[in-house]
């Protein structure tokens, strides 16, 4: 399905073997929709990797099975029926250029079975029941992550409970900025340099570490959870396209939360 969609968009935006900026602009619904489609496909692929890893480790229990089947049922249903890119924009496969015959090819018997029987009300209710029973657990089901990431999760979960949750509501009601004391503490814990290479003052950890940290801080207050993503985005752009002088000047400053 994805390869067919890529071919359709190529036909719309390529000129002499290269993407035309003007055509991408003119066909932005198809181009944007292709990005969403590719994201959905990759999300399901990674969901399957997660499930197979847990199965091999004998950790694929009822909660994990329900998460797996609900995710596949929902996303496959959206791929065929329409991807909600926002509240008022639904991406249909025909918007990318697929024909009705090409769309129907997706609905082979196994896909039909999943879309009809996986994401049911009974499955969702059972998952919610299990989530309530296990509300003391930090995550819903096994994450499949390594021990280092689990340790990072626990560290930032404790920080969020102690230093963020008790004050978050007041910050919100008073429309206050996050206190500098919190930002300084996060900097000391390495939040702003998680994925920045060590030679530039960062910790050189994986993108998964940034996701784990953001998740746990967001449990306390979503604004705090988003702080580290700002330097993450800026650092990635500088690493990919900046000069060595820019990297030497900016990346260590990001990692330490100091002014360059």
Per-region residue spans from a language model:
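FAD-binding core of flavoproteins
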Residues: 1, 6, 106, 115-119, ...
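Extended amphipathic alpha-helical segments enriched in small hydrophobics
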Residues: 1-55
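Generic structural signal for well-ordered, non-transmembrane alpha-helical segments
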Residues: 3, 32-35, 39-42, 66, ...
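Intrinsic disorder at enzyme termini
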Residues: 74-158
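Glycine-rich flavin
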Residues: 89, 158, 165-260
């Amino acid at each position: 399905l994805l390869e067919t969609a890529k071919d359709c968009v190529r036909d719309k935006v390529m000129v002499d073997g290269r993407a035309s900026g003007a055509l991408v602009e003119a066909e932005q619904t198809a181009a944007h929709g292709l990005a969403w489609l590719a994201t959905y496909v990759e999300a399901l692929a990674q969901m399957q990797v997660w499930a197979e890893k847990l199965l091999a480790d004998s950790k694929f229990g009822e909660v994990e099975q329900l998460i797996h089947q609900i995710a596949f049922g929902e996303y496959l249903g959206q791929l065929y029926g329409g991807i909600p890119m926002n509240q008022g924009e639904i991406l249909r496969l025909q918007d990318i250029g697929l024909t009705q015959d090409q769309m129907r090819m997706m609905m082979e018997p196994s896909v039909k079975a999943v879309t009809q029987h996986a994401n049911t009300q009974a499955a969702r209710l059972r998952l919610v029941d299990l989530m309530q029973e296990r509300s003391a657990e930090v995550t819903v089901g096994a994450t499949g992550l390594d021990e280092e990431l689990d340790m990072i999760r626990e560290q930032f979960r404790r920080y969020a409970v102690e230093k963020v949750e008790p004050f978050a509501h007041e910050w919100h009601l008073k429309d206050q900025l996050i206190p500098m004391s919190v930002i300084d503490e996060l900097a000391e814990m390495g939040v702003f340099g998680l994925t920045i290479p060590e030679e530039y003052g960062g910790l050189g950890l994986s993108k998964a570490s940034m996701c784990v940290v953001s998740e746990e801080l967001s449990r306390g207050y979503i604004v705090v959870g988003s702080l580290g993503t700002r330097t993450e985005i800026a650092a990635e752009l500088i690493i990919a396209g900046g000069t060595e002088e820019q990297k030497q000047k900016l990346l260590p400053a990001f990692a330490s939360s100091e002014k360059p």
